[in-house]
Amino acid sequence: MAVWLWPAAETEPQRPNSAADPAAATDPAPDPYLAACQTYYTGADGREYHVFTAMTPSIEGRTDPVGYRSELIPAGGTVDFPATVMVEDAVTQDYAAEDFAALLDSWDVSVTAPEGVSRVKLWDAEEETPESPALLYRRLRADPTCTHNEVVWTLRMKSGDVLHLTMTVEFEEQQALRITPEDAPLETAQELQALLDRLAEEYDADTSITVELPDVTYDAPVSVGCAVTLKGSGTAFAAPVTVMPLSDTERCHAYVRFSEVSFEGDGSGTGVTARAPTYLENCRVTGWDVGALAVNGGWVYLHGGYIGGNGVGARYDSAYSNSYTYTIRHIDFLNNTTALELLCLPPNSYAALDDCRFRGNGTDVYNPGGYRIEVNNGTEVTL
């Protein structure tokens, strides 16, 4: 994530329904993107359907039409999200994909872009499609060179009617801010907290911030209230860390990433509490009552690392988050009383354990909600 600095000769593109003249904004024009991405259709069965493009799953299970998406992408990075066609009963607003599908003869999806502009890539989402209420489901991947694309769905009905739905997507490269111990004092938890507080005041999620931490142990609680990557080099947190709720911008999701750090407890407390999307990449979490905890609004992405010697290794108790994944990948859960707890997940969620090892735990997975669990790529676990 990083701020996009607009050249002096340019102005920031107007968002849908925006107006340069404040007076004109009091009577906004219809949103052309929303007009292009949805339609109402009366089927041969006499039922009226609301058909629209969207990205799902959405926060708290709600699905809204999406005709325009703009996002900043770090240099060399990509974004990946669902691109779907949804169908609702126009009166009850209940999902109606199955009934509408009986009226559908064929369909296709295409991507158009100006000359010289890269195109986003679409592919089947085999794992997610059965869990989704969408009529049509693809995943979309883009990089910063996909500056302006139109994703066009064409639906051909058995009646001979043809429906066109268009979602416009725009992506640009972010600029980045990197802070090292040479740039700011980072030897103590108090110094780190002061830096994080300053970053929260001066930047939003449009700025890609990386803080390179020194080889120290932070022995006081730390609260993270900004979108940031904290990259360790022998760094340890020996007191609880809390990721506070963060605000997305129009073009960036806000999240916190911990990379190659250790969370070392004394048998009590919670190592990391995530009230916003939080990545733990190649981290060690040891010696806590609860090692990592996701609560409402937050999520914990576990990608590589070791979670051992905790009362509960990782606990998911989050009914909603604007960003989450199904996969826990390359994690060794060793010698925890309970390795993984699935108390509450967002709607239609499940857990996919990919190349994980569960050994020496009292209970490998506690799943009172009965969520679906997939075991992939040699994962060793007792369910």
What kind of region is each of these model predictions?
Residues D31-V111:
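Solvent-exposed, low-complexity, repeat-rich "mucin-like" stalks and linkers
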Residues V66, F100-A134:
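Low-complexity "stalk/linker" and mucin-like segments enriched in Ser/Thr/Pro/Ala/Gly
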Residues E131-C146:
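Extracellular/luminal low-complexity segments enriched in Ser/Thr/Pro
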Residues T168-L196:
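Right-handed parallel beta-helix/beta-solenoid
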Residues D219-P221, A238-P240, V261-G267, T286-V290, ...:
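Surface-exposed loop/turn segments connecting beta-strands in extracellular beta-rich domains
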Residues T229-G232, V256-F258, T278-N282, W299-G304, ...:
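All-beta strand scaffolds that present successive hydrophobic residues in beta-strands
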